[in-house]
Amino acid sequence: MAYLVLALSAFLALSAATALRPGRRGLFAALAFPVGWAAGELAGQALVVEAVLIALLHWWGWPRTDGLGEVVIALAALVAVENLALLAISFRSRTVVRRALEGAPDRALALPGSAEDRFGTWWRTALQFSPHPRGMEIHRDLAYGKHPRNRLDVWRLPDAGPGAPVVLYLHGGAWTFGDKREQGRPMLHEFVAHGWVAVTPNYRLAPRDPWPAPMQDAVAALAWVKREIESHGGDPDRVVVSGGSAGGHLAALVGLAGADPAWRPEGVGDEVDLSVRAVLSYYGVLEMTGDEDHWNGLGEGLVHLLERRVVQLPYEGHEDLYRSISPMERIGRDAPTFLVVQGTNDTLVDYRVARAFVTRFRASAFAPCYHVELPFTQHAFDVTASPRTSATTRAALAVATAAVATAGPVPPELAASYQAPPTVLEVELDGRRVGALEALTALGPYVVVTPDNPYSVPTPPEANARRRVEMAASLAALGLDARRTRASDPTGDWPSEEGFALAGLSREDAAALSRAWGQYAFYEVTGEGVCVRDAARGARI
């Protein structure tokens, strides 16, 4: 009995040590995930197991072999210290997540604090179990294509909708395995409990169906959502897409380049709107060329997997193809809002990949990118309902909720005021304000976008001032020359709004920028005068 307790205690100690400091090369990296994951997410359970082992040994009788009992006690103490540290780190994730959202460079989000936010639901933490929301309905195995794996499930509460927001979740599994019933459960349960409709598709897998089959199916599933989700209470205009690992890669690529003809599936025409409001990427593979500047020794293994099983083409000679399927290379100004969640101890996807993606996104896109970097956290941490999973789920729900609130077409009650604006528009040039048409001489044709009063809801002056500071910093990071503007209503029916004049910005980019800041419309100033354009389509109002 003593030797059994010794062996199990040694394994628990090794597992916890691997969770705290995993190997990152070769076989050590491969073993670090299955060995270290258990301790990282089940630290409380490991403490209970160790206590039971010591109790059993005490009941059975302490070993008579000299020094063996002392070794067992020393190992038990080590297991206790390691797992208490891991448990503290897991609960600390709540603070890490909150600070990540509140400290975002622009459009910061506040997470509400509560007793549950600090401690979690104790029985969920103990059991690592996320139950279905009460009354949840699951419509299983609905066909979205012809292949046997083109099946999806729809989760909803009976009273969801009409017009409920939708989350499309793509499972992971290295593009070669996985199932819609296996992953993302704690997050999806929380979304459904808050009135969302969740859609979980299967998709074709390599090596039987190599790239672009997985991506074609992901796009086909999104097209099904756009066409059919209204019959399940969802709003096709308020869709976010999420996924973990390979699913995070597919979700990111759907959000950034879902309309690319290279993977547009049969039967999905140009008339289908394939845009999404946000992407929630959990430990996603956001770089597909294996660049070791980001992968820190793991890139060779990625490229080997892609060459042999997924893409089934050598990287050499097909570099453009590999770059085209890399989300990091597809970031445009009109990219949707992103949440990037990544653990620093992930031995399958290095955390530097997420850092590089976020840096490039913030220098390229108008929408916000929220980056949650979790210390001492492995791949696939969100399989169980741990305190860490609870914290990141709250972040995902907050980001998704903000994204689906983004302004759409101009509401009818505002259209009349936009068509005949009584606004005096001024632009700041060389320290003085000049009229909108006078500024044409210096700037040429330009657009004016404001961050004030998002969704045309009057906002406190201090909040508008903060958003202007954030927008100025964001535009500077994008390398855009922005001049301050002021639009005032002589009748006094609407408060004055400040914003930025941008010369050389296309109408499409102006619309994307306006949407990213929650605006229904923007000004366009040309030699023909000042007009107001709809941010949803860029059409003149």
Question: What residues fall within each predicted segment?
Answer:
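N-terminal cap/lid segment of alpha/beta-hydrolase-fold proteins
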Residues: 35-55, 64, 110-162
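Short beta-strand element of the alpha/beta-hydrolase
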Residues: 163-174
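Catalytic nucleophile-loop/oxyanion-hole region of alpha/beta-hydrolase
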Residues: 179-190, 199-238, 383-392
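Primarily recognizes the serine-hydrolase "nucleophile elbow" in alpha/beta-hydrolase
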Residues: 220-294
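Mobile cap/lid helix-loop segments that gate and shape the active-site cleft of serine hydrolases
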Residues: 290-330
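Short beta-strand/loop motif that positions the catalytic acidic residue
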Residues: 334, 340-342, 346
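Conserved alpha/beta-hydrolase "acid-adjacent" motif
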Residues: 347-356
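Catalytic active-site module of serine/aspartate enzymes centered on a nucleophile-bearing elbow/loop
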Residues: 387-407
